[in-house]
């Protein structure tokens, strides 16, 4: 077995990326403090052709040197926008028939492995602050909640790790038959 060289990875150009059919997922990051987390989510979004990222509240925006360190240029490929109020963002997404899903530990959440996708549906995944999670007001107006099952003592994952887990799972469910 031989490790592939970068030149063998069949990378898309920025133009090809922008013209590619996108995965019908929108990532909403609300009040994310860590610039490294923001950059990591951009990189994940690039890897799985995510439609766009919506940055809300205190979440920093590109261009930013610290975001760029972990995004590795993904801020140039992934569409993004910034809005102050996550509640308005969720309401507007719902008006556009986007199913809004908080990624949070709540009563009646659906475990990620049990969540069934509809192939013709667009989804918005709402991720909250590193300390407080998704705000209760946002949880209350989302169409549903997905929980990543955890078996250890912390029941807390880094937001960029959570985004990677959920995005991969939904990407797989949307793109490949079971």
Q: Each PLM stretch: what is its role?
A:
Residues 1-178:
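Post-transcriptional modification and biogenesis factors for structured RNAs
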